[in-house]
C-alpha cells in the first residue's frame, strides 16, 4: 500500500508594504510522499511571497505535469502568473513562459542553471528567478 500525503499546517503573516498586501494565511499544504521537505518549504514560501488575489496551489499536486505548482488566475479563470518550484526542465519553462508571467522559486539554483544552459526558452529574459540559499531552507 502506498503512503498518503502528509498535511502540514502553517500560519503566516504576510506584510508587503510595496504591494499593499497584509494578510494572515492559514495554509494546509499537502506533502506528497516523494516530495522532500526543502521543496515543500520552498513551495510554501513561494506561495506567501507571491501572494495575491487568485493564487492557488495546483489541484493535482506533484502529478499535475500540465499545471503550474502554483498559479494566479483572474476571476474569469485566465492564467496571469505561472509559478515553478525547484529546477524545472528547459522544455517546461519554454512552455510555461508562453502562458504569461513566469517565476521560479528555487533552492536548486545550480541544477536549474544546468537544465537551461544552451536551451531555447521563450522570453527567457522575462523569467523571474528567486533563489533561496540551501542553508536558509
Show where each model-derived region lies:
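Acidic-basic catalytic patches of nuclease active cores, encompassing PD-(D/E)XK
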Residues: 16-61
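Domain-level recognition of nuclease-like catalytic cores that cleave nucleotide substrates
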Residues: 114-137
